[in-house]
């Protein structure tokens, strides 16, 4: 909370950003959440006043219910997303592949996914999981190679959301 206060509140930065949005120089004002749940909850508690246009959160099928196992500062994406939905704030999704880890699964898990959708990449499952939620505005993806871009285009054009069974299968990976 102290960093938020010193960087954005006490020095008038947030007020400045709000005025810039009001003047039309900022179209969409939001924030990217990284770790301190007190800051997240505080900023959302002020949504009626601040009118966030979006919030960027980390969401993938590991972080959905097991974020603290990845990093003790993290908060489960299920909670973060639910809080955004309550306030009708669109979500921008970062880390849908958990830093690439969800594109490189062990052979057993990969086989289970390939059995269901043989033509799809393992990465596409993580992207489809993140894109399944109705209040997701966009899913960010870091791409290194042309084949990553092509796979992403196949996955998102058009996006086929996970079925309930596929959603559950993704969550089984974390069990």
Where do the PLM segments sit?
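Ligand-binding pocket scaffold of soluble enzyme catalytic domains
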Residues: 125
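N-terminal pre-core extensions flanking Radical SAM catalytic domains
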Residues: 130-168
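Histidine/acidic-residue-rich catalytic or RNA/ligand-binding cores of hydrolases
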Residues: 101-110, 150-156
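Conserved small/polar residues in nucleotide/adenosyl-binding loops
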Residues: 173-174
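Short Gly/Pro-enriched loop/turn and capping motifs at secondary-structure junctions
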Residues: 98-99, 146
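Glycine/proline-rich, positively charged
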Residues: 1-93, 97, 105-109, 117-118, ...
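C-terminal active-site-proximal or functional interface alpha/beta core segments in diverse enzymes
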Residues: 121
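Short, glycine/charged-rich beta-strand-loop motifs at protein surfaces that mediate ligand recognition
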Residues: 113-116, 138
């Amino acid at each position: 909370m102290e960093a938020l206060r010193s960087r954005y509140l006490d020095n008038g930065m947030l007020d400045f950003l709000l005025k810039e949005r009001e003047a039309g120089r900022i179209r969409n004002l939001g924030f990217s959440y990284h770790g301190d749940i007190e800051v997240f909850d505080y900023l959302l508690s002020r949504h009626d006043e601040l009118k966030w246009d979006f919030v960027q959160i980390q969401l993938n099928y590991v972080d959905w219910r097991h974020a603290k196992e990845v990093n003790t500062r993290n908060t489960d994406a299920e909670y973060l997303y639910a809080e955004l939905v309550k306030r009708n704030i669109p979500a921008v999704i970062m880390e849908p592949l958990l830093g690439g880890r969800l594109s490189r699964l062990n052979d057993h898990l990969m086989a289970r996914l390939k059995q269901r959708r043989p033509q799809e990449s393992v990465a596409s499952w993580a992207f489809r999981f993140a894109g399944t939620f109705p209040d997701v505005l966009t899913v960010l993806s870091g791409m290194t190679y042309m084949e990553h871009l092509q796979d992403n285009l196949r996955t998102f054009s058009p996006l086929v959301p996970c079925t309930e069974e596929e959603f559950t299968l993704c969550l089984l990976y974390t069990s």
